[in-house]
């Protein structure tokens, strides 16, 4: 296997040479490594430096980069696992080069997690984490970290695949990125509560090509009940921008109060807050000292997530303006107009044209048209 050196954060490691002319270069190497996931890995290192779990499992290590970085930059006991025998020599070589006390195993991830528990478990498969979620929950003492890259099924572009994998109906809406994140959160919640455990989102976010969940798992029937109380549906009008949030497991038939069209249920999904402001604040305070390559991007993400309203959906206000046949205002003008009208409003990390607000739809329409400018 031909390898080259790469560096992320303060960690230097070996990765396989990729064919840069391929349609998806990471898939051309014998062992998988995706450079575009550096932000994801940086966020993991930063979060774990705050949480300080007693040990950590990188359940699907591939090159082992994520686990290597956690061991080297966070300084906690790490196990790196991969079921591919071809990946193990490279992981071991990287461990030896760094002189790290890391345990390396070659196991099926589910089998390992059924037999052994870790304080923090990281599941980062190629595609959907759904087949590994139950084992991940059973093998996690406190912190469960999940990545999904099957954004098309999660966001409703591949509807039947989304229903099969997550037992939920996605929605290909103007806020499909948030739908995907909340569908995945809802799925993990339902898998967790059957063990009389609950979930507490610490830092969950979505990018163009992946969704990342960082969760604290809590114990007891009451914790499970609190999680169930945060599950429900979004009822979306197929014609206009109207939607409403509906807690509970069984959505009734409803019609849009503006169009009269039947509302389409999206879910079940997670309706609660997707991050902990306390944890995000601690991550921001620690960020400048971590030497991360995506520091500026991560700082922007953390700031936006802290300011983002906890509502369960957002508006792509450019898309709404197109429906209204008007030119969209500047986003700050729109936010100020909504606030001046007495409502909360914020940007969203999902999209540069995403706006969250608790304003009724007519107020949002007027603000986009410029009728209630401050």
Swiss-Prot record:
It catalyses: guanosine(26) in tRNA + 2 S-adenosyl-L-methionine = N(2)-dimethylguanosine(26) in tRNA + 2 S-adenosyl-L-homocysteine + 2 H(+). Its EC number is 2.1.1.216. The keyword Aminoacyl-tRNA synthetase does not apply. PROSITE patterns: SAM_MT_TRM1 (PS51626). The keyword Methyltransferase applies. GO terms for biological process: tRNA N2-guanine methylation. S-adenosyl-L-methionine binds at residues 41, 66, 82, 108-109. The gene is trm1. CDD domains: AdoMet_MTases. Residues 4-368 form the Trm1 methyltransferase domain. This is tRNA (guanine(26)-N(2))-dimethyltransferase. It is an enzyme of class 2 (transferase). Keywords: Metal-binding, Methyltransferase, RNA-binding, S-adenosyl-L-methionine, Transferase, tRNA processing, tRNA-binding, Zinc. Belongs to the class I-like SAM-binding methyltransferase superfamily. Trm1 family. Zn(2+) binds at residues 237, 240, 256, 259. Pfam families: TRM.
